[in-house]
Amino acid sequence: MPVDMAVRICLAHSPPLKKFLSPSDCRGRNFVNRFKPLRPCLSLKKESESRSNEWNRSKSRNKKRVVFADSKGLSLTSVHVFSEFKDESSLDLQFDLIDLEDITASLKLHEEKNLILGFTQPSADYLQFRNRLQKSFVCLENCSLQERSVAGTIKVKNVNYTKSVKIRITFNTWKSFVDVDCVYMNNVYGSTDSDTFSFVIDIPPNIPSHEKIEFCISYESEGQVFWDNNDGQNYSVIRAEWKSDGVHTPSPNKTDIASYEYKKKPQNNDFDQFGSPRTSAGLYPEWQSWGKIGGSPYW
């Protein structure tokens, strides 16, 4: 039967696999070993073995030892004696207490007193300022103290092209004085009837408290000299004391300071030549509030 023949062929022994391979492939190697898994690259040790290795490694290290100095014949302490007069440079650091008291007293006096202006700004009342300028041909416009210097501006009538404006100032109650030239300033608003000059004067330090600081202004043009001396009182810089609230007040021990304080002119109903709103202030006090016109300078 054909089926019996096929079964016999399948059950027959197959030829060995090495007959299909060349002799060079089988020489010197084991065919079965080629299909074995590779050995892992990481070597895993047991936990007990790692601990034993660390213990043996710690035993091999050198042990730390503490040795005292006396065991080697050395002293346990070191004593150094300082002489009281060994260093003479320390004597230079000694201060005399009396000198320190004088220094602190002068510093305290300097802190309590400062310099302030002994007059109000001339241009605060602009109409009165214009009247003085028309009358005297020269008038201080404004002034301020900047640290240790006096600065301000001056208005003069434009009489001639050639002008010379100077500040005459004294720091010792007119025992001596200095004339300082003022600098011309270009008129911003292009006024033709007046010119503006500026000045900056340094105040020397250590001025005695009893000496006065005063100045006035001279204006020379076409051989004529005009003066502005604050109506005979001169412009003064006085000393003041600081109060706890930070307000400047004149020193109480100066009796002559009252003569330099500004006295407000009593209000009257006189008509001035400019026809200003100040005239109607006496007749109709509420008139300025109607037109929202104030008494302060317009700038």
UniProtKB/Swiss-Prot annotation:
Select a single GO molecular function from the record's annotations and give it: glycogen binding
Q: Is Cell membrane found in the keyword set?
A: no
InterPro entries assigned to the protein according to its UniProt record, in alphabetical order: CBM21_dom, CBM21_dom_sf, Pase-1_reg-su_3B/C/D_met, PP1_3C, PP1_regulatory_subunit_3
Q: Which UniProt keywords apply?
A: Carbohydrate metabolism, Glycogen metabolism
A biological process term (GO) from this entry: regulation of glycogen biosynthetic process
Look up the domain of life of the source.
Eukaryota
Looking up Gene3D superfamilies in the UniProt record yields: Carbohydrate binding type-21 domain
Ranges where the CBM21 domain occurs: 130-238
Q: Does the keyword Electron transport apply?
A: no
Q: Name one Pfam family in it.
A: CBM_21
- Give start-end of the signal peptide: none
Question: Which Gene Ontology cellular component terms are annotated?
Answer: protein phosphatase type 1 complex
**Chain location of the short sequence motif PP1-binding motif per the record:** 65-68
Oligomer status and interactors: Interacts with PPP1CC catalytic subunit of PP1 and associates with glycogen. Forms complexes with glycogen phosphorylase, glycogen synthase and phosphorylase kinase which is necessary for its regulation of PP1 activity.
Quoted from the entry, the domain comment is: The N-terminal region is required for binding to PP1, the central region is required for binding to glycogen and the C-terminal region is required for binding to glycogen phosphorylase, glycogen synthase and phosphorylase kinase.
This molecule's function is given as:
Acts as a glycogen-targeting subunit for PP1 and regulates its activity. Activates glycogen synthase, reduces glycogen phosphorylase activity and limits glycogen breakdown.
Q: What is this protein called?
A: Protein phosphatase 1 regulatory subunit 3C
Query: What gene makes this protein?
Result: ppp1r3c
